[in-house]
Amino acid sequence: MEQNNGTTEHPKEVLDQTNPSNEVTGVPNGNHAEGEGDQNAGEAPGLFQITVKLPHEPYKIQVMVSNQEQVQDVRQSIVELPGTFQYTSFHLEHNGERINDYVELSEVKDLKPDAEIVLVEDPYTEKEARMHLVRIRELIGASGDRVDNLHGICAGLSLHDSVAAGEQLSDDIPSKEENSANGTAEHALVGYEVPGPADLRTILPRKQAPFPKTVKSISLSPWNPPPYHLRQKGHLLYLQVTTNEGEQYQITSHVSGFFVNKCSNSKFDPFPRAAPKNYSAHSLLTLISLISPSFENSFKALQEANNKKDLLTTFPFQNSIPHNPWLVPPTSSPATAHQSDITRPQENYLIAGVDNSETLRDWNEEFQTTRELPRDTVQDKVFRERLTSKLFADYNDAAARGAVLVARGEVAPLNPTEGRDAQIFVYNNIFFSFGADGVGTFASEGGDEAARVAVAKDVMGVKAVNQLDIAGLFTPGTMVIDYLGKRVVGQSIVPGIFKQREPGEHQIDYGGVDGKDVIAKHEAFVPVFEKLSKALRVKKHPVWDKDGARHELESSVETKGLLGTDGRKYVLDLYRITPLDVLWYEDSENHEPYPHRMSVLRLELVESYWRFKMGQYVKEEVEKRRKAKKEAEEKAEESKPNGEAADASENAESEKKETTSPDQERVDISDFKLALNPDVFSGQVPQTDEEKEEWAQDEKEVRDACNYLRSKVLPELIQDLHDGDVGFPMDGQSLSQLLHKRGINVRYLGKLAALAKEKGARLQALTALMTQDMVARAFKHIANRYLRNLPSAFATSCIAHLLNCLLGTEVNSKPRAEIDESLREIYPEGDFSFEQVTPTALKEDIEKQIKIRYRFSLDADWTSSLRHLQLLRDISLKLGLQLGAKNYAFDRSQLKNQDHSPAANGTRTPEEGGKKKKKKGSDQASPRPAQSPAPAVTFVPDDILNIVPIVKDASPRSALSEEALEAGRISLMQNQKELGQELILESLSLHEQIYGILHPEVAKLYHQLSMLYYQSDDKDAAVELARKAVIVTERTMGVDSADAILSYLNLSLFEHATGNTKVALVYIRHALELWKIIYGPNHPDSITTMNNAAVMLQHLKLYPDSRKWFEASLTVCEELFGRQSVNTATILFQLAQALALDQDSKAAVNRMRDAYNIFLNELGPEDRNTKEAESWLEQLTQNAVYIAKHAKDIQARRRRLANLPTRLGTKPQPQVGQTTSEMANAAEARGNASLDPRSIDELLKFIEGGESSAPRTKQKKRAAARNPKLRGSKQSTVKPSS
């Protein structure tokens, strides 16, 4: 049954009716995870339909509901349906009795399928009237973009719809060369140049037609608010509406609804007009349709325009912060034009009320009461995790906004007499401080540098504790933002943290007080800290106070326990939950001192080391058993006569086969224990010999863990990348994700770059990428140093000057900072030292920073090998820059392009300047800055349109949805397909309910599920999920993120599998264009993509084009892997086939011979690849002349050969860091990825369309019912048929 809660489809302006932030369903869609919720097994909630009776047209609607939905979810469905979204203030009745909004439908008396409930309009309150106005403005398209401190320009942008529709690229910047495929091209790859320059227009929003205007304006009236005596009569607000006909109406918002009043701009008379103009209605939407004849038609056109977009592209963010693009349209573009909107300054009042108290929340109490919610049943867990996810999202949003204000100096400190770094702030019930050593806490650890690192580590520690979710242990809400060079920490206020204790009492109840001099202990903390330490592999250990007294602690001495005045046990300062990386410091003899002593091992490394040691333990146990068994058998044989011994040995052999293996596999690991002491090497002094011996053992274990990182983890990563066993990183972000996944700290970039250099040319791309990332990170540290004490008005001047010194030296070797001197005078205490920076000084500073922080020496000519655009992007993402789009000139030859760019200097082009006729709508674009007569530079301050905060949060992931996903995967691996798919759908629904639709975790799940469905040969479901993965990835991680590229590539693969090859090529082209921007040409993983493109072109019988793409792939492969590699031979094999199909038989023979020779040398004559190449070579050689004349006829006569190397099948793109073992399921599900099990005959039929693809199976409609989360899409999500 298809679920759409009625007969009309959703409006695009409103949330999906199963809005994850409002729905409180226990188990989604009535499906239960296997093995869970047995207590509800008999209830089987299911879906059923009810009728809602309305007071106005259409008078009745049908709504699909579930027993376990709450009544407020039904309300939300009604509010979001196009026929009923004018209702906001109402209640529901059943059998004449009012239904409580917060009960489940199963608790409503006598409510059965097809029952009728009645919608009854309620009187408005002042708050409901304000919310009604905000909602109606959004519905009718009258609200402009909100400007705030957190969401930047084009936040949450998605390009998928524009790419899929083949829309023209933005004209905000001129193309360097018009090489894009036009609408008449045979396919999307026509004109694409593999080594060509990056086109920045690829990541800009396409030009959009303006939306239909429904009203000219709708706002609060100048007569608002009502005077006291009229408030007593029920007047709530006064509004002013100007219709498209040009008529202005003054409207009174009354407790009973809305009516047109008799006010004018100069006369106050807020009472209803006389008939026949006495328009009134309960809903403002209805009233506007009464006073404006054109409203209904224009509103319908607006809905139609919105319905053309995918719902996910317009869906509002609920549980995550949208991604801010680093490159945005220039200020001259209509996309970023600032437009007049009288209601924009009124929105704070409309949303938060007169005194703003409606948005003030007790964050800490909300966090802790949410943690204390029951978690006994599945429904309890779902409700608890959904509330947790929403709460963290709200807190992160509020804390980030407050932190920006603190960083800009707009919040008064609580201690204004202290130094700037020591000041603390409270804003919106959140406690803020700077990530600097204002009071000398970290003086011995590295001062400000140590404090800055410690607060970031603390957030990671809080996140780890939140994920463990230990009952009885609480953490404050914690997040960190980096903004304008400052690091600001935001924490929820723990009750009692500011309380002055009695003399003799400590501020802290467990752990170190005032550094490590005094140790506090409280027995109530021991049980919960014991659980925490066990989960984090932390060893219980002694510490000593300043008097040498011994104290046994469960955690690091740096980790604090505080008993709040609310009676809860809080854990604070979680920056030292893993040991110090001692080998890093001991290795500093040959290097300059590291800036701080806060360099600890990552939790992922500790977990990896634990698994490694456990593996060793299991091997030793198995070896012991084998040895013991062998000795027992030998003794038994010795004690028996010869005849019996012979018989016994035969029996023993057979029994050994049956029993030994399972016994050896089962090893009890409960005796295996490994925990690390986080306080070794940090100044503790053991007192007795026994203590010293124990401490030495702890130190040895930590050294072994550090050595494991250096001697095993680092070389293994380099080897995996060398062998192509993991997806190759594309930019700084994907590189750091890869390192962190393996437990490698970013400080090891230098060590990794040195190891990559030793591997030679094959890892040259990795060395370049790591060098680029080190330069970007060093630049970030330097920029932060100059920005920290600089007035915010000069931030763009500082950044533009530093960028000119790094990236613009070929345009101007002696750039000068552009500063408004008159503005400088009003900031006498500002630090303007950035003006003194020169390209030479900056280069030396970067080299120094890299040497200190990464222990790596750059080549003398490193500046000449910079990839300017990619480095600019990395720097922008690290500093939160949003740059105006233009063709940035990185050398003098590019200046011409820049000069003619509309965004470069702001002047009109000759064509524009020559026209005297005023263009329609030109008054809406923002004015352009006047051209500066200053010398040419690459960057000017006006290029930096915005700076957004970089947020680090402590939000935990959903354990429940991950468990369901893992259970589904295991079931599929065990060939329990139906159960596996059921659990996976369960996980999908849980993800969407808990995180909301727009969240990075949901994007990752869509990506994973699309691959699972593709492997299960459910191609339509794979396409639908891959499309969703693309959109959600773009909006939450960035339109040019590495994840977005992978999502586009997999979507192209799935589209091709369903027969939409031309669409697939559109996606491939877009992904390749993105690749050029974030990495440049010739990325190692692009070989797979180019091969896939070539195969798709063969599928379309475009053999010459296919041949070109194989040749391009071969060029990249030879450059990366060398001429004599198996990879190169594989592509030569494919290219030979392509050449044969392109009727170039001589070249085909030569390429196949090259492939054969490489296979022979590298793999030997008996290898399958060698034999297949030999077989093909014989056939091609014998039939060279005939193939050239008629390839199909000749090949149809060829005998069937053994399996052929692939090379004509498309392959999925591995995710960055994904190992081949992680893709093993794909190989099992689809056969060996490197082999194509078809004969030459079949290959020819495949290439020429004889076996294009399996017909698309029609999916059962019930699939939509199983996942109503996806009901809002234009097409119902296709699920696998069972």
Curated annotation (Swiss-Prot):
Compositional bias (Basic residues): 1257-1272
Similarity comment text for this entry: Belongs to the CLU family.
Annotated TPR repeat ranges: 1003-1036
BP GO annotations: intracellular distribution of mitochondria; mitochondrion organization
Stated name of the protein: Clustered mitochondria protein homolog
Coiled-coil stretches noted in the UniProt entry, renumbered to this chain: none
InterPro entries in the cross-refs: CLU-central, CLU_dom, CLU_N, CLU_prot, GSKIP_dom_sf, TPR-like_helical_dom_sf, TPR_rpt
Chief subcellular location: cytoplasm
Keyword entries, A-Z: Cytoplasm, Repeat, TPR repeat
Region Disordered: start-end pairs: 1-43, 631-669, 892-936, 1202-1282
Ranges of biased composition (kind: Polar residues): 1212-1223, 1273-1282
Protein role: mRNA-binding protein involved in proper cytoplasmic distribution of mitochondria.
Stretches with biased composition (Basic and acidic residues): 631-641, 653-669
Extent of Low complexity compositional bias: 924-936
Domain Clu: 341-585
Subunit structure: May associate with the eukaryotic translation initiation factor 3 (eIF-3) complex.
Pfam families registered for this protein in UniProt: CLU, CLU_N, eIF3_p135, TPR_10, TPR_12
Single Gene Ontology MF annotation: mRNA binding
Organism field: Coccidioides immitis (strain RS)
Subcellular location: Cytoplasm
One GO term describing the cellular component: cytoplasm
